[in-house]
Regions:
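Glycine/proline-enriched, intrinsically flexible loops and inter-domain linkers
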Residues: 1-203
Length: 203
């Protein structure tokens, strides 16, 4: 309930701003914020040496299969742009450890913002110089009906681990150890009494 009320208050404040300053002024301010974030991130990327960098991390298993779930990352830096490619990452799994595409993107940007320029405004402008490729059907970009109950709690770790490994080749003196390499979870399983389907939920 507190989160809902916070969102409603935020909505009210935004409406008040539009009523006070008008859409043109608000739009110009938003464009400026986006541009500022883009410029700062481009400057941060420019300070890194051009090249191609590789990293790999993994989850020990998916919960339903003992095989490791691999996350592979190829990062290319050219001037003020960066391309992050997760081709080679394991296909989506039957266990609840897949992560939706948007959560995987957050894992990439979280690390880049933290270590390249923590002062970059949190908006999409900072994304403009960064292209992220995540093949559909992988554990980082699954398709229906792949379970994604773990979302950012589980595969977020290997995504961040890959990005930290890449930055470790570029700015090792600025890095910490991995931010997280997994999470402790509670699993609940059973049968849906209305449909008879097997259920497995991860908390």
């Amino acid at each position: 309930m507190a989160q809902l009320q916070t969102a409603r208050l935020g909505e009210k404040r935004v409406i008040e701003l539009y009523e006070r300053y008008g859409p043109e002024t608000i739009g110009a301010c938003l464009s400026t914020y986006l541009h500022q974030a883009e410029v700062r991130m481009r400057n941060a990327i420019t300070a890194l040496p051009d090249g191609v960098y590789f990293a790999e991390d993994y989850l020990e298993n998916s919960g339903t299969n003992p095989d490791p779930v691999v996350v592979r990352c190829k990062t290319e830096i050219h001037g003020d742009t960066m391309n992050v490619d997760f081709t080679g990452t394991s296909p989506q799994v039957a266990g609840p450890t897949n992560t939706p595409y948007t959560c995987s993107l957050c894992g990439v940007f979280n690390v880049l913002k933290t270590f390249l320029d923590p002062g970059v405004l949190m908006n999409s402008g900072g994304w403009r110089p960064i292209n992220v490729e995540i093949p559909e059907g992988t554990t980082l970009n699954p398709t229906w009906p792949a379970p994604v109950c773990g979302v950012s709690d589980i595969m977020f770790g290997p995504v961040q681990g890959c990005m930290l490994a890449v930055l470790g080749q570029l700015i090792p003196d600025l890095l910490s150890a991995t931010l997280r390499s997994g999470a402790n979870q509670v699993n609940a399983s059973g049968t849906d009494p209305t449909k008879g389907n097997a259920l497995w939920h991860l908390f």
